[in-house]
Amino acid sequence: FQKCSIDTYLATGLEFLKTVERPPLDEYILRRNNLAKALVADGIDAFVVEPGYTFSYYANVTQPDWEPEERPFLMVIRPSKLPNGDVIANTSFLVPHFEEIRARLLNMPFPEEISTITYEEHWNPYITLWESPIWGETLSPILMVDEEMRDFIARGLSLNAFDVVGLSGEVEAVRQIKTERELGILKAVNTGTVEAIRAMRKCLYHGVTENEVAEVLDNTVRAAGMDPFFDIVEFGKQAALPHGGHDGTATLKPGDFVLIDVGAHLYGYSSDVCRTFYPPFFPNPPPPEYNVTEKLKVWQLVLDAQAASVKQMVPNGTASAVDLAARGVIEAAGYGDEFTHRLGHSIGIKAHESPYLNKGNFEAILRPGMVFTSEPGVYVLNQFGVRHEDILVVREDGEAENISGGSARSPWEP
């Protein structure tokens, strides 16, 4: 099974990998400069972040590189206006004095030596930051932080002369609107993940367990140099729970739908795709004794709902309108109560990012370069579940672009 899956995958040629590369130095400079312009637009003095996804986005340092602890290690990005009027980022790092050399050894993507503000163990690090000359004449700088900032650090800043506000506005949009390089990586990792599902499907056999499929699929994804980070594998009635919860010992039988939702990483970017299909040993057309009429009807219904949502992924549309387009198709067919979750979410270096596509999100306005999942589903308790998930990018003109290898074509061609 494992050899068949990997061999089938590699036989595709892995074309999706041939035009993609790790983000270079100038990509990180562009991101920080875009952030600086957004800070000016939002009236913010600096964006402050500690190691995590956002730190990685702007400086290529992940939590495994520098695990957050009780001593603050903060990146402080401020806007700086050039004589020609252009705005660029000016970045400093608040770091314990004894860790300064370690911070410099991280080889962060900066064209010059990084600028540090150091503090001793017995000092107040937040006062040290406030007393640094980077603020000029500003007495109470306005700092923006995101949801990854731990509460004790946000409180430390706000109790020591800083005005701390949450993530919003143009600053939040910087990560939401992907560059073409980012889109290239997202296309590669999501197409590669879908192709791995398609390759593995051809090797499925009667009696295999959900756990065995998950393991084989993970190793298949790794064969392309990607790093899997979650699998949902459900057979038959198990798929009526959208995110599973069973022990993975269910075995595959003729007539079972297979629902697979999987994510992987490539160059720091995430895939998140789902396919629902029949195994290769189940004939097309199905034998009448299996009574799969409703399953086939729902499979197509969910695909139609996804197509309706894609038509609403246009500039200046709302997140709510995208969800409601898919939900309306499913409700009209009488399965509204069986569509139990939101339609989707944005995706990037995290699998789940804002904005979120739910029917109550009227505030989020779609902009070119935003990337979303569309993952409608119908879950008939104790019988079966169907979900189709693809990745779409909002384009300036025309319909949103599928960057996950094309949508499913039939239960035998996922």
Predicted feature descriptions by range:
Residues 1-414:
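Active-site neighborhoods and metal-handling regions in enzymes and metal-associated proteins
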